[in-house]
Swiss-Prot record:
Residues 198-201 are annotated as: Aspartate. It is found in: Cytoplasm. Keywords: Aminoacyl-tRNA synthetase, ATP-binding, Cytoplasm, Ligase, Nucleotide-binding, Protein biosynthesis. It catalyses: tRNA(Asp) + L-aspartate + ATP = L-aspartyl-tRNA(Asp) + AMP + diphosphate. The keyword Secreted does not apply. Its EC number is 6.1.1.12. It comes from Streptococcus thermophilus (strain ATCC BAA-491 / LMD-9). This is Aspartate--tRNA ligase. Homodimer. It is an enzyme of class 6 (ligase). Belongs to the class-II aminoacyl-tRNA synthetase family. Type 1 subfamily.
């Protein structure tokens, strides 16, 4: 028989009607001579009732045989429950079973199909198809679908054109490691899976498309963490003839529309702006979480004459004040914070507490000469804990920024009902890579430098600023964009500044440079991380919760066992030979 409706949508207005439902057995129990079955489908649970006294014996026998996760088809009459269950949307009704069929049986599942499941991440991923049956997971993907639907409608209304760009493209430097795909036809040659459609979307602007968008898969072979996956989805935009403010306005409108449609939240526009330098100096992060205070304070000048070499000789001394919580931090717990700080390059962590109106702690004796000034500068009060880092400015900022976030989580200082958006602007064009021993693009090599700093491409690269902008939500980079270079000579200068010879520049990017000979318009754009956005909207802390079939922290899939070895014949066709490290 045809299904009449979803089980989770049966309501009081259906009382007295005969319906057919199909789904999974969530549980079965015998009580007071009756058999109760909870039927689950994607819309929720519905209680079924089998009364052996007035039900066909074959139906009763089938009902008795049911186990969790059996797939069934049931027909019956909707009746009012004697005692309503206010915890269920269907709690006012139940289905009096008249016919029952088992469509498929099921083994005992490795974990219970319910929210709050107690199973390891790898077990959940090994049986992802079972994990996805849980109501919480289904809701995540309904939310994701609503977000993408809203985005498409918004951009379609603004006359953006949805264009698919290639998945098999050219490997280019300046970025994370590429995923490579060997060519069978051109042996020894490789495609790369795109880290983003950056160059192709710029070429679409040269083609006159004017406004492009795509919800697109991207790939990066990088170390993983909670908000990263090797394959991810981004909302990709590019426009011609718009300035950065106009692009930001479009983005803000898109986000406001998504927030209203999916969360019922009215966000205030325009979003706040914060310079990159202010973000790093005050929050210790280029993606600051502004839902709580505890800003970084610069004490370099104040402590330069104290009798404590660690402070007096450090290039920078900065601090954060943990207000009113010093009593929660014993020496042992501060030692743990010190170990945490060392992960970010700090040599150690100095601290003092305000106890009975005076500063106490290992370094307090070195600060007596400036205690009053220090107390005033930091507004230290009773039961405050002050944490200091003395090092380079970069290490001090990064370390205290990470400590700030860690402590806020430990002390439950963050209001998780808030959605704090902001733009981080005025970015440096380059960042120094200790590993590479050279300057690298802070974003990518096609970012437009500011007009007043472009001359430094042949001088001090640390002084070059970019017409770039990142959008941040609650301490996460939601996306980033920039105006792009559209003049060939400037693009050549940019590549030269990054260490490309003329020959290597044309070998890697010749097709883009050639395109700049043919009337390339001014253009710019942005990309938003869809997975990360949905994760934050769903209140999760790992994007695996909003990706149907994600990879684990080893970039592998416990369900399909990907990546896997392949047959020698396949390798021979590709003219490849694999040597494993342990061979």
């Amino acid at each position: 028989m045809e299904r009449s409706m979803y089980a989770g949508r049966v309501r009081s207005e259906h009382i007295g009607t005969t319906i057919t439902l199909k789904g999974w057995v969530s549980r079965r129990r015998n009580l007071g001579g009756l058999i109760f079955i909870d039927l689950r489908d994607r819309e929720g649970l519905m209680q079924l009732v089998v009364n052996p006294e007035n039900t066909d014996a074959a139906v009763v026998e089938t009902a008795e045989s049911l186990r969790s996760e059996f797939v069934i088809e049931v027909t019956g009459t909707v009746e009012a429950r004697e005692q309503a269950n206010d915890n269920l949307p269907t709690g006012a009704v139940e289905l009096k079973v008249e016919d029952l069929k088992v469509l498929n049986t099921a083994k005992t599942t490795p974990f219970e199909i319910k929210d709050g499941v107690e199973a390891s991440d790898d077990t959940r991923m090994r049986y992802r198809y079972l994990d996805l049956r849980r109501p919480e997971m289904l809701e995540n993907f309904k939310l994701r679908a609503k977000v993408t639907h809203t985005i498409r409608n918004y951009l379609d209304d603004l006359e953006f054109i949805d264009v698919e760009t290639p998945m098999l493209t050219k490997s280019t430097p300046e970025g994370a490691r590429d995923y490579l795909v060997p060519s069978r036809v051109s042996q020894g040659h490789f495609y790369a899976l795109p880290q983003s459609p950056q160059i192709t979307k710029q070429l679409l602007m040269n083609a006159g498309f004017d406004r492009y968008y795509q919800i697109v898969k991207c790939f990066r072979d990088e170390d993983l963490r909670g908000d990263r996956q090797p394959e991810f989805t981004q909302v990709d935009l590019e426009t011609s003839f718009l300035n950065e403010q106009e692009i930001q306005d479009i983005t803000e409108g898109l986000i406001a529309k998504v927030m209203k449609e999916t969360k019922g939240v009215e966000v205030t526009l325009p979003f706040p702006r914060m310079s990159y330098d202010d973000a790093m100096n005050n929050y210790g992060s280029d993606k600051p979480d502004t839902r709580f205070d505890m800003l970084l304070q610069d004490l370099t000048e104040l402590v330069k004459d104290v009798d404590f070499k660690v402070f007096a000789e450090a290039p920078a001394v900065k601090a954060i004040v943990v207000k009113g919580n010093a009593d929660k931090y014993s020496r042992k717990s501060i030692d743990k914070l010190t170990d945490f700080a060392k992960q970010f390059g700090a040599k150690g962590l100095a601290w003092v507490k305000m106890t009975d109106g005076v500063l106490a702690g290992p370094v307090a004796k070195f600060l007596t000469s400036i205690e009053e000034k220090l107390t005033d500068a930091l507004q230290i009060e009773e039961n405050d804990l002050v944490l200091f880092v003395a090092d380079t400015l970069e290490i001090a900022n990064n370390t205290l920024g990470a400590l700030r976030n860690q402590i806020a989580k430990e002390l439950d200082m963050i209001d998780n009902t808030k959605f704090n958006f902001l733009w981080v602007v005025d970015w440096p064009m380059f960042e120094w890579s200790e590993e590479e021993g050279r300057y690298m693009s802070a974003h990518h090599p096609f970012t437009l430098p500011t007009e007043d700093s472009a001359a430094e491409l042949e001088g001090d690269l640390s002084k070059v600023r970019a017409v770039a902008y990142d959008i941040v939500l609650n301490g996460y980079e939601l996306g980033g964009g920039s105006l792009r270079i559209n003049q060939k000579d400037l693009q050549e200068r940019m590549l030269k500044a990054l260490g490309f010879s003329e020959e290597s520049a044309y070998e890697q990017f010749g097709f883009l440079l050639e395109a700049m000979d043919y009337g390339f318009p001014p253009h710019g754009g942005l990309a938003l991380g869809l997975d990360r956005f949905v994760m934050l909207l769903a209140g999760k802390d790992n994007i695996r919760e909003v990706i149907a079939f994600p990879k684990n922290n080893k970039a592998s899939d416990p369900m399909t066992q990907a990546p896997s070895l392949v047959a020698d014949k396949q390798l021979e066709e590709l003219a490849l030979h694999v040597e494993l490290e342990n061979e």
